[in-house]
Amino acid sequence: MTQTDLNNTEQKPVMVLKVGGALLQCDMGMSRLMQAAAKIIASGQPIIMVHGGGCLVDEQLKANGMITEKLDGLRVTPEAQIPVIVGALAGTSNKTLQAAAIKAGVTCLGMSLADAGMMNAKIKDPLLGLVGEVEPKDASYLEFVLAKGWMPIVSSIAISEQGEMLNVNADQAATALAKLVSGSLVLLSDVSGVLDGKGQLINSLNREQVNELTKIGVIEKGMKVKVEAALDVAESMGQAVQIASWRHAHQLIALCQGEAVGTQIQP
C-alpha cells in the first residue's frame, strides 16, 4: 500500500451500521455480516455497529408473561418491563453479536449508549413509558476505541441524568451516533430497502416522496421510524443514508466502493 493509499484510508468517515430484526436469530446471517465487517475494517474503514433486538425482546417478554405494545412503530416500555428489555438488548443481543464478531476475527467492544457520557438521554414521551431519546454529547470514548482499530457494538439502552434506564429505538440511536462521529449511516433491516405498494424496491427517496408514501400507507410502522431517522441524518449532515438488508452482507463492501445498494434516502 502506498502512502497515498494510507492517506486515503485515514480520511474514510466512520460507517455507522445499524443491525437488528431477525439477524440475531440467524447464525449464518451474523457470520456473513461480521466477515464483511472484518474486510471493511481491514481496508481502513472504521465501523460502529448499533443494534436493537426486538425479536428477542418479544420472546423474553412473552416468557415472563408480559405483553408487547407499540405506538407508531415504537415499543411502549412500562417500568416493569425494563429489566427484561435491558437484559435482552444490553445483555444477550449485545454479546451474541460480539461473539459473532470475535469468531470472524473482529476485535470489538460491547457497550451501550450510556457509556462514557457519549449521549444525553431523556424520556421521549410519557405515553411510551421508559422510551428514551438521545442527543450527541461526547465522542472522545468512541474516538479512542476507533483509533485502536476496534469495532464498538452499541446496544440501544441509555440512562438519563435522573438515573432512569431507557429503551431507545435502535434506528434513532444509530442516527444520534452518526451525528456524534460525523459518519455515514447504513440502516440494515430484514428487507432489501423501502418497498413500494407492489413490493418492489425503491432506489431513492426524498422527504416529499416519503411524505406521500406515508400518507397512503406504503411506509408505516417500523419502516416509518427507520425512514424518518434516515431523513434526519440525511438532512442534518447533507448526505444520503442507505437502507438495505443484512441478508446481502456482500453489498456492504460494494457500498464502501461507492456503489448504491438498497434505498438511498436523499437530503
Curated annotation (Swiss-Prot):
Q: Where is this site: Transition state stabilizer?
A: 18, 226
Any one Gene Ontology BP term: arginine biosynthetic process via ornithine
A GO cellular-component term linked to this record: cytoplasm
Q: What reaction(s) does this enzyme catalyze?
A: N-acetyl-L-glutamate + ATP = N-acetyl-L-glutamyl 5-phosphate + ADP
Q: In which pathway does it act?
A: Amino-acid biosynthesis; L-arginine biosynthesis; N(2)-acetyl-L-ornithine from L-glutamate: step 2/4
| HAMAP family, alphabetized | ArgB
Matching PANTHER family:
N-ACETYLGLUTAMATE SYNTHASE (PTHR23342), N-ACETYLGLUTAMATE SYNTHASE, MITOCHONDRIAL (PTHR23342:SF0)
Query: Which NCBIfam families does the record associate with it?
Result: argB
Q: Could you identify this protein by its name?
A: Acetylglutamate kinase
Species this chain originates from: Shewanella pealeana (strain ATCC 700345 / ANG-SQ1)
